[in-house]
Amino acid sequence: MARIAGINIPPHKHAEIGLTAIFGIGRTRARQICEASGIEYSKKIKDLTDADLEKIRDQIALFTIEGDLRRETTMNIKRLMDIGCYRGFRHRRGLPMRGQRTRTNARTRKGPRKAAQSLKK
C-alpha cells in the first residue's frame, strides 16, 4: 500500500483517483501531478514503482495539503470572524454567507429544524 503525505492511498485505484484521497487534491490537480511527474494517470497505484511514488511525492510537496490546508482554512475563517465583517458574522451565526435565502431552505448550514414551541397558558 502506497503512503503519500501520511495518507494510505488505495492500491486498487487508478493514480488519478487514488491521489484524491489526499485532502486538497482533486481530480484536476491529481491529473496535473501525474503529468508533471511523467506517470500515466490510468496506471493503478499498486503498479507504480518506488521511483514513480517518489516523483509524485516531490510534486505534491509543492502544494498546501492535509493539515496545513485545514489549518489555513480555519485561520481564514477565524480572521473573518475577528474583523467583524459580514461573512465572519454569518460564519459565527452558522448561516449561509454567499447571499442564499434563509427563510426556507439553508437546512445544511442551519442544521435540523427546531420544534415549534407551543404556547401554554
From Swiss-Prot:
A matching Pfam family: Ribosomal_S13
GO CC terms in record: cytosol; small ribosomal subunit
GO annotation, biological process: translation
Stored Gene3D superfamilies: 1.10.8.50, 30s ribosomal protein s13, domain 2 (4.10.910.10)
GO terms for MF: rRNA binding; structural constituent of ribosome; tRNA binding
Keyword presence, RNA-binding: yes
Region of interest: Disordered: 93-121
Source organism superkingdom: Bacteria
SUPFAM superfamilies per record: S13-like H2TH domain
Entry keyword annotation includes Glycosyltransferase: no
Coiled coil feature spans: none
Keywords, ordered alphabetically: Ribonucleoprotein, Ribosomal protein, RNA-binding, rRNA-binding, tRNA-binding
Assembly notes: Part of the 30S ribosomal subunit. Forms a loose heterodimer with protein S19. Forms two bridges to the 50S subunit in the 70S ribosome.
Function of the molecule: Located at the top of the head of the 30S subunit, it contacts several helices of the 16S rRNA. In the 70S ribosome it contacts the 23S rRNA (bridge B1a) and protein L5 of the 50S subunit (bridge B1b), connecting the 2 subunits; these bridges are implicated in subunit movement. Contacts the tRNAs in the A and P-sites.
Protein family (similarity comment): Belongs to the universal ribosomal protein uS13 family.
Protein name in the entry: Small ribosomal subunit protein uS13
Species the sequence originates in: Variovorax paradoxus (strain S110)
